[in-house]
């Protein structure tokens, strides 16, 4: 350790090097990383932000060795609150976090132009949400475990629309299919196949 001491404790500004190659440069309080500081991990990751009693706390940016990045709030060492995660693939999530997971309200942008905007539970699209497809199609409704499940509306680019129940990403249950030409089919669906058509 190189830095300031007060009463035999690391206090103020200092640098600490671990045997595994990790390093912290920043503020200390009573032997704890506390305040503003940068932690360089042995695996190439880096965290630049606020600390409280050796834990990431408050605003901070975590740079992953693979090129991914998280910029947002932390609590007790975990992503918590509002934050943006950028994957090396080009995908990006902007929204709420809880206990290191996408949780609450948020939007996930994909490199192909598609995006999901809605509710999340433990890294899964779950609750109410809208998925905008890159080809112009759109689904608005309920989700469970990253799949369309419950009540929802799917609109195709050509103007066709399905309003009804979904299960496991497929039209399943009671629903109405509206054709762009004005025709409609109403009835029961099983795994995206309509059986009881009523015109």
Predicted segment positions?
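Conserved anchor residues at repeat-unit boundaries in beta-strand-based tandem repeats, strongest
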Residues: 1-11, 23-34, 46-58, 69-80, ...
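Conserved small/polar residues in nucleotide/adenosyl-binding loops
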Residues: 196-199
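Aromatic (phenylalanine/tyrosine) cluster motif
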Residues: 32, 39-41, 64, 144
């Amino acid at each position: 350790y190189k830095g300031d001491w007060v009463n035999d404790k690391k206090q103020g500004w200092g640098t600490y090097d671990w045997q595994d190659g990790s390093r912290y440069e920043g503020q200390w309080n009573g032997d704890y990383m506390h305040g503003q500081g940068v932690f360089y991990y042995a695996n190439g990751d880096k965290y630049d932000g606020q600390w409280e009693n050796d834990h990431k706390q408050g605003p901070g940016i975590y740079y992953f060795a693979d090129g991914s990045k998280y910029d947002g709030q932390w609590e007790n060492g975990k992503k918590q609150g509002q934050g943006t995660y950028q994957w090396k693939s080009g995908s990006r999530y902007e929204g709420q976090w809880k206990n290191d997971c996408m949780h609450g309200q948020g939007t996930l942008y994909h490199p192909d132009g598609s995006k999901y905007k809605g509710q999340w539970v433990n890294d899964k699209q779950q609750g109410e949400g809208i998925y905008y497809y890159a080809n112009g199609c759109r689904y608005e409704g309920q989700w469970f475990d990253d799949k369309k499940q419950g009540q929802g509306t799917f609109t195709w680019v050509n103007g066709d629309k399905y309003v009804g129940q979904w299960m496991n990403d497929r039209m399943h249950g009671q629903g109405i299919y509206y054709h762009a030409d004005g025709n409609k089919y109403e009835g029961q669906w099983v795994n995206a196949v309509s059986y009881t058509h009523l015109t």
